[in-house]
Every structure is written in structure tokens, then in C-alpha cells.
Amino acid sequence: MGCASAKHVATVQNEEEAQKGKNYQNGDVFGDEYRIKPVEEVKYMKNGAEEEQKIAARNQENLEKSASSNVRLKTNKEVPGLVHQPRANMHISESQQEFFRMLDEKIEKGRDYCSEEEDIT
């Protein structure tokens, strides 16, 4: 019995088969349905200036409405639900407190000996 791979005959593609393979790789074998088509004018593309004017007018109305509602909100001193309350239940560990104390001390003292060695010019 022989090796199964020895029974395979290696063939060289002819030019037609080679071109067919390249077409598959390049996507050229797909029909016209996948090619780029010209843009057709549709209903929403017609009367573009009129539609743009309507949209601009609608946007302006919405801006005026939102501006007037913002003025009303600002006149009220305190709006419930919109003011963020500080977190009362925030837990800070002792190591975090110690770290921030040390950081505050370093800031108060100014530059340390390591930063004095660096020449900043």
C-alpha cells in the first residue's frame, strides 16, 4: 500500500483557470446586481429647498421652546431631583486617609529633594 498523498497529481493551472481564480479573488465574478448603480431621484430628494425651510422653521420653534423652558427652570431656586447631594455613605479606608494626609503635606512643603536634582530649563 502506498501513501495517499503520493497518488495526487500536481497540475499547473492554465491561463483561463488562473484568470477565473483571480476574478473570484477580486470579486469580478459577481453579476451586475452587486455593481455600483447610479442614484435614482426619489421623493425625499425633490423639493429640497422647501423641505429645508420647513425643517429650519421647526428647529427654530423647538429652540425657542427649549430656551423658554430653561428660563423657567433657572427662575426656580431649587429644582428637586436635579441637585446632586454629596455622598453620605462613602467609605474611605484609613490607608486612603493616610495617603491623602501625606500628599497634602508634600504639597505644603513644596519640591522634594528628588525634584530639586532635576534641572528644569
Swiss-Prot record:
Annotated InterPro entries: DUF4612
Entry keyword set: Phosphoprotein
Tissue: Expressed in spleen, prostate, testis and uterus.
Positions of modified residues (Phosphoserine): S95, S115
Region feature (Disordered): 1-28, 60-82
Protein known as: Uncharacterized protein C1orf21
Organism: Homo sapiens
